[in-house]
From Swiss-Prot:
ANK repeats lie at residues 317-347, 349-376, 380-409. Pathway: Protein modification; protein ubiquitination. This is BTB/POZ domain and ankyrin repeat-containing protein NPR2. Residues 138-152 have a biased composition (Gly residues). The keyword NAD does not apply. Pfam families: Ank, DUF3420, NPR1_like_C. Salicylate binds at R484. It comes from the Eukaryota. The keyword Zinc applies. SMART domains: ANK, BTB. Residues 138-157 are annotated as: Disordered. Zn(2+) binds at C197, C202, H204, C207. The gene is NPR2.
Amino acid sequence: MPARSAVVVIAMEPSSSITIASSSSYLSNGSSPCSVSLAPPGAGAVAAQAAPVAAGEGGGGGGGGGGGGSSSVEVVSLNRLSANLERLLLDSDLDCSDADVDVADGGPPVPVHRCILAARSTFFYNLFAARGRGGDGAAGGGGGGGGGGGERTGGRPRYKMEELVPGGRVGRDAFLSLLGYLYTGKLRPAPDDVVSCADPMCPHDSCPPAIRFNVEQMYAAWAFKITELISLFQRRLLNFVDKTLVEDVLPILQVAFHSELTPVLEKCIRRIARSNLDNVSLDKELPPEVAVQIKEIRQKSQPNEGDTVISDPVHEKRVRRIHRALDSDDVELVKLLLNESEITLDDANALHYAAAYCDSKVVSELLDLRLANLNLKNSRGYTALHLAAMRREPAIIMCLLNKGAAVSQLTADGQSAMSICRRLTRMKDYNTKMEQGQESNKDRLCIDILDREMIRKPMAVEDSVTSPLLADDLHMKLLYLENRVAFARLFFPAEAKVAMQIAQADTTPEFGIVPAASTSGKLKEVDLNETPVTQNKRLRSRVDALMKTVELGRRYFPNCSQVLDKFLEDDLPDSPDALDLQNGTSDEQNVKRMRFCELKEDVRKAFSKDRADNSMFSILSSSSSSSPPPKVAKK
């Protein structure tokens, strides 16, 4: 009886059809439920038995048997069989798998049942049959060396996804989705956090995670020869092309070229040809023949603009030589090329190129030359930091930020590096809680780095800026830093004095009052002849000195800094009168006195702990400052 049931399942498959049960917006991002059936593998005894049974059933477009009662019974039976097979994937306690597959994004291997995969896919049938006959496990027509992944204890085979799907990347979620279809005959809707990005302003119908998920599914469906899914995913990809940014069209074009999807490929080529995507990106991201085709279309459709773009072949040649030197990780050669020609790093957009295509070491060495404008925008309105955010490489983002890249710079369409990174990050990766000692997700790490920088530098203020709004922001930042340093001098005078000496904060005038050396207590006189640019430089120099003071305090006196953080965030009152212990009702005065005693004890403990932990810090301060080290009064 079980054998007959298996034959009936295969016989019913050709008469099944695709059913969509949701709106088109859900369909576009791959999250709509649909049911698709697979044609028989066409190899082995199972396929030989399927043909006569299918003929006996009639094989028509709608039915699977004789009467209506028989049809309904078969539908119920098939749904029950589908649910039972799905348990093999979902129920961790029911582990009767006999092979494993390592996926591209790491983590534990995915267990599979070779008998089910072989019955449902000619790819897996050929792969496992070749291994059973003593072969290397390579499936004919592009299966890869699946058997080369090694053996577990007990002879359990292990396959690598990059060998099963050569030329394409398939992540865990996309592979599990395809497995679910092979096991159950139904393509379940994609989880929302897999096809949605971490940008709260995104509608999530065509954001990069949804595109990547469908691209990965297409790679897998093409490699596993699941023809009906190829047709479904092709329609989804066609829907994405005109709705998303041109950068997100590139992976669609790549999978269309790899999987020979002519309609998708032609539509992607037309979209990119109409865009302002530069030739460097075309040459680096696309197959050579496709890049040439796009350039030819541009020259034919816009001949006049084509002549102006390639106006200086010598200049273009010099730019390509610098880019090739960067590809070779040879920054010394870049310096030689700059010396022997009149071209600059900015002319060649060398920093943009390195941020997009080179490793962090090359970017760091290029920044050390101090010959490139960190915030220069290329022809498409992107800075090097924007390109590093698109690449989602934490080391490169940190290199640029440490050298002074402006985190608040916007692209032509109003995107910041933070919003770019959020748009490229899956909600699943953003919300994943990392255990201690576990490697952090790179996408989430990039967002955290940019987020901290946005908090530290909420707005880049140029020397020439005279906008009242920007000036107010600078004043607010100065007031916060002045208050923080003032409370540090009140609570921790010795530590504050050392930190201010090393940061040279005592050489810049305080904001709004006379320097501490003066005892008049009067407000600082306003220089009416001071230009806005001069005033801005003076205020920024004070901000830099105070910022360095705070950073030194966090580095060498962390416990004192924690007390200051808590006081400024939780205990600092809105009104100065609230600090007076004599004001307020008797209950309020008691609360103030209790909190004052608690704060006093926190200050004493932090002072003692930092003093014990940093007993050698006075040596550092004496070597970092021209003035003699301060003498700390003994208690």
